[in-house]
Amino acid sequence: MVEFKLKDPLLDQLFEAVLLLENVDECYRFFEDICTVAELKAMAQRLEVAKMLQAEKTYGEIAERTGASTATISRVKRCLNYGADGYKLVLERLKSETAADRRQQLCSRDLSSSLGTRKKT
């Protein structure tokens, strides 16, 4: 079991509140109230940096695409290698969800195609 360095009741409450959000629109509403634009952009940037590091992109490619400094890229890389595996957990789930979404779209398209090609009797 991972021991969390930041564990405290206020953070527990915050994370429980986040878990209550049901969709992206609700996330926008909550995070726009609780974070500054700069804080949100920084978190989004770090997630993209982690994604690109996992894809073995170079620091130069990452900096150019995201605008992240090499210090930020290094911090994210350190977390990927030695952190609590939070980035890995989320990126794997995002990848799985994206794959599941693609499968769902393909199934829907295939179903629509097969229904559209049936002869009417």
Where are these regions (language model features)?
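Short, solvent-exposed alpha-helical "recognition" segments
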Residues: R78-R93
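Short alpha-helical "recognition helix" segments of helix-turn-helix
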Residues: E61-T66, I73
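Short, Lys/Arg-enriched anionic-surface-contact patches
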Residues: D25-Q45
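General nucleic-acid-binding
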Residues: M1-L21
